[in-house]
Curated annotation (Swiss-Prot):
Active site: 278
Cofactor: Zn(2+)
Name this protein carries in UniProt: Uncharacterized metalloprotease YhfN
Top enzyme category: hydrolase
Entry annotated with the keyword Metal-binding: yes
Annotated GO MF terms: metal ion binding; metalloendopeptidase activity
Superkingdom in the source lineage: Bacteria
Keywords: Hydrolase, Metal-binding, Metalloprotease, Protease, Zinc
Organism in which the protein naturally occurs: Bacillus subtilis (strain 168)
Amino acid sequence: MRKWIAAAGLAYVLYGLFFYWYFFLSGDSAIPEAVKGTQADPASFMKPSELAVAEQYSNVKNFLFFIGVPLDWFLFFVLLVSGVSKKIKKWIEAAVPFRFLQTVGFVFVLSLITTLVTLPLDWIGYQVSLDYNISTQTTASWAKDQVISFWISFPIFTLCVLVFYWLIKRHEKKWWLYAWLLTVPFSLFLFFIQPVIIDPLYNDFYPLKNKELESKILELADEANIPADHVYEVNMSEKTNALNAYVTGIGANKRIVLWDTTLNKLDDSEILFIMGHEMGHYVMKHVYIGLAGYLLVSLAGFYVIDKLYKRTVRLTRSMFHLEGRHDLAALPLLLLLFSVLSFAVTPFSNAVSRYQENKADQYGIELTENREAAVKTFQDLAVTGLSQVDPPVLVKIFRGSHPSIMERIQHAEKEENAPEHQDADK
């Protein structure tokens, strides 16, 4: 047992050392020659000191992300190989009389252990954001958000475990298919209630306060055939200096949300471009496409998980102290497989997201007919968020849900030079 834990610990340390070297010792932040002197060149809109700080901040945040990903994996492996997972199950069975309550208790203890192990890394990330003046959130507010997240995820997680293990016992061969079929309406339900029930637990949402800006947005929304009452402002200035806007929800609860930091720090032309971008997501139904894609990928994922889970339990039954696939003590193994597979498909999902973001950028430029506002918006996003204009390759692959700032500015410049725009100017 100790050898396995030591080997896993060594692998984790070597993994961390690689990413330390990757971000802090080997990084080449040189701007391509073709970009120098253009609007995509960070030297044209950021001071040397700002560039240095953005580089430092991004490297630290990226490093924390990459060492955080396998931390759960290491924890789950240790719980299994040490027999702690089995001991927790036996302890709860002795303390609680009913199977339902035993499952709830086991999930609670596992969730609590996972939270306590990952909390220090989350705390470091929060402190880094404070140190670089990105976060404005108080410690009490940050702690409150952590508690809210735990009590939102715990009942959802518990429900999933109860259903999955019931299916594994009753339908050993087809449990993965039935589980996926149940996730379809469940995912739709969560998407539907998120804007009106879950999100307001963290922040205050309200209609736009700036009525003059609202009238401009109404005109833009009318051009895009979008209901104006679907545009909201959210109070984020108490937590961050960063800028953002997004589309969320489905059906009657679908809405476009603007952070108040965005409204406070950008001029009207930039805000209108951002609205045009988000309207592009709305018009092109990217939320629905993303949801459909998620459900299709999850179908394949459940199938793969079933095969891996069955084979892994058979091969490691003795080492992990498991009775079989139905054993609740095997839950860390199931979570390990889900987590690894989810991370493995991240490059694909990010590539799809970058494509959609690029399309939304194009839509926003065409709707507002203001390329300069788009370029200025991207530049301001980099400055206020201390974003790397051209992040390292692994960051683009595993964290890049949006094109890089450099790519977005270059795309905007290409949009300006496109044949249809040249023809329109003649």
